[in-house]
């Protein structure tokens, strides 16, 4: 079951059902689907701001591609034998974001929300993460093994100064102190059962 409008679009030999709804209603489903709707209020509020920021960046990116101001992600040649293809929401041409983990998990109202979810959405309404005058592309992963990766190495071939690698249990404000590009060090890290949140 979904809120909002349901629009049907024929694209070639495919029929798309597109759910259109206000951003804040979408976010209630997303933060209830991506994590537990019974999480603490502060965690839900943080997730609402992160998800709202990410969504608005995707919507702007799609609009810029439609207007010809920005191009879609292109493969990056690493060598003659190897290339990297970044799969991003610009792969969507008929809608802003999809309903799966590729974008943000959205399950309509089938995923139960809670009063805390509604309170988190209301308390953070309109709040965004900003870096200078740019809305942050606040992508996230549900698990990182104890060390997050820099944006440019896992999401898109673009440096984002606000999404750097961090160690989960490192003191706040310190840089990662482990070099996981070294195979032996990475293996030791994984086998040590690091604190990962």
State the predicted function of each range.
Residues 1-197:
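Conserved, single-site charged/polar hotspot
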């Amino acid at each position: 079951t979904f809120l909002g409008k349901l629009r049907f679009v024929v694209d070639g030999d495919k029929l798309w059902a597109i759910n259109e709804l206000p951003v804040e209603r979408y976010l209630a489903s997303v933060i209830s689907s991506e994590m537990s709707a019974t999480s603490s209020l502060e965690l839900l509020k943080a997730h609402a701001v992160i998800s709202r920021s990410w969504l608005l960046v995707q919507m702007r990116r799609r609009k810029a591609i439609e207007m010809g101001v920005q191009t879609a992600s292109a493969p990056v040649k690493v060598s003659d034998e190897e290339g990297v293809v970044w799969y991003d929401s610009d792969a969507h041409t008929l809608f802003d974001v999809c309903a799966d983990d590729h974008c943000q998990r959205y399950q309509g109202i089938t995923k139960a929300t809670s009063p805390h979810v509604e309170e988190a959405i209301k308390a953070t309404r309109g709040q965004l993460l900003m870096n200078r005058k740019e809305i942050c592309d606040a992508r996230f992963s549900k698990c990182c093994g104890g060390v997050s990766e820099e944006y440019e190495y896992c999401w898109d071939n673009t440096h984002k100064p606000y999404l750097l690698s961090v160690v989960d249990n490192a003191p706040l404000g310190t840089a990662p102190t482990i070099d996981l590009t070294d195979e032996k060090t990475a293996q030791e890290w994984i086998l040590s059962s690091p604190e990962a949140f």
